[in-house]
């Protein structure tokens, strides 16, 4: 019946909102445990290294590496990436400034570090190496698909360590490796590590405006046992993450963007996490670190070896990330209904390829989904109509049997069987539609392709709310009309008032929803109105519906 339908619609939205809260925002931050200024350089597999700071009195310089999609700033002290600009992602809608993913500022930092530890590693307890490079600015030239930038350091024994950054055209995957030349008479033992370090306190503007919950901002990793696991920054110090795995990756997430170091596919790697410089008296103080260590490498005397891996710095582009590391594409977090959301996204992407507009693609996918669900909707309204016709008989049963619930239930089941009516027929189609709506919700919320994607007129960004609230008002108006045209048997005055206020409540809630999602709901309501009109006309011919309420 209509009351159940409305209540289920309310439940649908509440479930989607709760899933949003639980999936994107994990439990509240815990009080950080006290810690001293712990070393950023990880312990090698051979043992701990004493505390040290990243700072050094040695002179160092900043290098600029530029491809067609990335602009990196590399500090010759340690060879850390201290800034990363995504050249094809703008800072804001209408802005020509590229989005800055990695940065190092006095108030906060988010950087990608890498080095060599182990017995003969150059990143040790005393200081990190200062590399030299042939220039300070390097760019991918026209006609070339790859940019290789080497930096060199020679230790006290004369061993040469060449750290290389490899940037490829149209790729957010950066190769980072070391070419080590051992000129000594003894073997060298080194271990590559790559890690990300970020201030625990969330950056300004990281929360979604309005009533929507913030996107997940924290660490994540993948191992042989855990395909995809998220770790809150506030918990990373207590978690004491130490996972041995083949392949795998360790990264940090920021809604549409991810940075991740990948492991060696055919060897045992170690994923680790910790918090440094934590002050127990200051909430969210210190820095979170997550990284991956490759296996120990032994370089024979008077020989050379290469050790390294790749680093993803960019938007969550599923196909490209899947090619870089297994399960890295799972950072596009569609929640528990990923098996529905994934094909929906592929369909949405296909439609966008045909029409070239994400808003039009949303309209088309809504019509397709509603078209597929039409037989279920027809079955739902037919069942509701039959149940409505049974109301006089059900009322007579209640009057005749009184409070005898057992006899009442038995008599009702016999009546349903005799009249060939399924009492759950009106609910079942809605239960099927619910996961589809929630999955589409996640698809629209998690897909970076919709970031700053325009539709038409005033809708210049489908990933944010409608600036003039036109779509939420249309959604409320169409919902009110659906309610008005649908027959109801509600006689209780309180229930009638609740039903009347539902369009207002939904309108208010959708004021802060992304305009892409609201567009879906408006189009869905319009299609529902058309479908209901057709279904009611068919039911009228069968004597199951009357336009008079």
Curated annotation (Swiss-Prot):
Segments crossing the lipid bilayer: 6-26, 349-369, 424-444, 462-482, 503-523
GO cellular component: plasma membrane
Keyword annotations from UniProtKB, A to Z: Cell inner membrane, Cell membrane, Chaperone, Membrane, Protein transport, Transmembrane, Transmembrane helix, Transport
HAMAP family from the UniProt entry: YidC_type1
Cysteines engaged in disulfide bonds, as pairs: none
Subcellular location field: Cell inner membrane
Name of protein: Membrane protein insertase YidC
Assembly and oligomerization: Interacts with the Sec translocase complex via SecD. Specifically interacts with transmembrane segments of nascent integral membrane proteins during membrane integration.
Naturally occurring in which organism (per UniProt): Tolumonas auensis (strain DSM 9187 / NBRC 110442 / TA 4)
NCBIfam families assigned: PRK01318.1-1, PRK01318.1-3, yidC_nterm, yidC_oxa1_cterm
Function comment: Required for the insertion and/or proper folding and/or complex formation of integral membrane proteins into the membrane. Involved in integration of membrane proteins that insert both dependently and independently of the Sec translocase complex, as well as at least some lipoproteins. Aids folding of multispanning membrane proteins.
Pfam families: 60KD_IMP (PF02096), YidC_periplas (PF14849)
Membrane topology field: Multi-pass membrane protein
GO BP: protein insertion into membrane; protein transport
A GO molecular function held by the record: membrane insertase activity
Stated family: Belongs to the OXA1/ALB3/YidC family. Type 1 subfamily.
Keyword Transmembrane in annotation: yes
Region described as Disordered: spans on this chain: 35-55
Keyword DNA damage: no
Domain of life: Bacteria
InterPro entries to which the protein is assigned, alphabetical: Membr_insert_YidC, Membr_insert_YidC_N, YidC/ALB3/OXA1/COX18, YidC/Oxa/ALB_C, YidC_ALB_C, YidC_periplasmic_sf
């Amino acid at each position: 019946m209509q009351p159940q339908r409305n209540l289920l619609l309310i439940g649908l939205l509440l479930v989607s909102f709760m899933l949003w809260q639980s999936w994107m925002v994990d439990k509240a931050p815990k009080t950080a445990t006290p810690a001293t200024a712990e070393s950023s350089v990880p312990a090698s597999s051979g043992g701990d290294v004493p505390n040290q700071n990243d700072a050094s009195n040695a002179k160092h310089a900043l290098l600029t590496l530029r491809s067609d999609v990335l602009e990196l700033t590399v500090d010759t002290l340690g060879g850390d990436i201290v800034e990363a600009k995504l050249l094809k992602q703008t800072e804001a809608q209408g802005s020509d400034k590229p989005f800055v993913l990695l940065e190092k500022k006095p108030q906060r930092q988010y950087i990608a570090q890498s080095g060599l530890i182990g017995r003969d590693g150059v990143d040790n307890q005393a200081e990190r190496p200062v590399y030299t490079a042939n220039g300070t600015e390097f760019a991918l030239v026209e006609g070339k698909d790859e940019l290789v930038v080497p930096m060199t350091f020679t230790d006290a024994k004369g061993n040469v360590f060449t750290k290389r950054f490899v940037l490829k055209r149209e790729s957010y995957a950066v190769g980072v490796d070391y070419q080590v030349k051992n000129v000594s008479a003894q073997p060298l033992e080194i271990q590559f590590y790559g890690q990300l370090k970020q201030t625990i306190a969330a950056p300004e503007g990281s929360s979604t405006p309005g009533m929507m919950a913030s996107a997940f901002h924290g660490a994540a990793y993948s191992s042989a046992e855990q395909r995809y696991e998220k770790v809150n920054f506030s918990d990373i110090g207590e978690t004491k993450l130490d996972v041995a795995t083949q392949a795998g990756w360790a990264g940090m997430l920021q809604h549409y963007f991810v940075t991740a170091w990948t492991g060696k596919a055919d060897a045992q790697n170690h994923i680790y996490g910790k918090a440094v410089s934590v002050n127990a008296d200051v909430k969210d103080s210190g820095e979170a670190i997550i990284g991956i260590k490759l296996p120990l490498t032994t370089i024979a005397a008077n020989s050379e070896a290469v050790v390294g891996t790749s680093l993803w710095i960019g938007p969550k582009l599923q196909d490209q990330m899947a090619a870089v590391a297994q399960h890295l594409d799972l950072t596009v977090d569609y929640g528990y209904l990923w098996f529905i959301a994934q094909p929906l996204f592929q369909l949405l992407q296909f439609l966008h390829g045909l029409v070239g507009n994400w808003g039009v693609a949303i309209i088309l996918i809504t019509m397709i989904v509603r078209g597929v669900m039409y037989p279920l909707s027809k079955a739902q309204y037919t069942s509701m109509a039959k149940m409505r016709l049974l109301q006089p008989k059900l009322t007579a049963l209640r009057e005749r049997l009184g409070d005898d619930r057992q006899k009442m239930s038995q008599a009702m089941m016999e009546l349903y069987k005799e009249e060939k009516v399924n009492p759950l027929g009106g609910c079942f189609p809605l239960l099927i539609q619910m996961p589809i709506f929630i999955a589409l919700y996640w698809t629209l919320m998690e897909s970076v392709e919709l970031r700053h994607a325009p539709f038409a007129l005033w809708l210049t960004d489908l990933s944010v709310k409608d600036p003039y609230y036109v779509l939420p008002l249309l959604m409320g108006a169409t919902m009110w009309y659906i309610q008005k045209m649908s027959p109801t048997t509600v006689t209780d005055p309180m229930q009638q008032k609740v039903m009347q206020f539902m369009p207002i409540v939904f309108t208010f809630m959708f004021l802060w929803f992304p305009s892409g999602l609201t567009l879906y709901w408006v189009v869905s309501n319009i299609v529902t109105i058309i479908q209901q009109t057709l279904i009611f006309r068919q039911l009228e011919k069968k004597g199951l519906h009357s336009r008079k309420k």
